[in-house]
Amino acid sequence: MAREAHLEAAKHHIEAASKHLAAVGKYNQGDIHGAERHSEEAWVASQVADGKSVEAHRMATMALKMKLV
């Protein structure tokens, strides 16, 4: 279960990175407003991905504790 949670978190991190790259692309094209919008979306996606990572690590820690008990 923790493994699946880590894979899900990784998927969200890749999505966030893609949004960050889209923001950079818009900025490089001179589209400041588009870059700002993509940057905000990327920030939100990063927060979601970080939350998923925290949950995955919590699951892994609990699984390890159960194994050691």
What is the meaning of each model-derived region?
Residues 1-26:
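N-terminal acidic leader/helix
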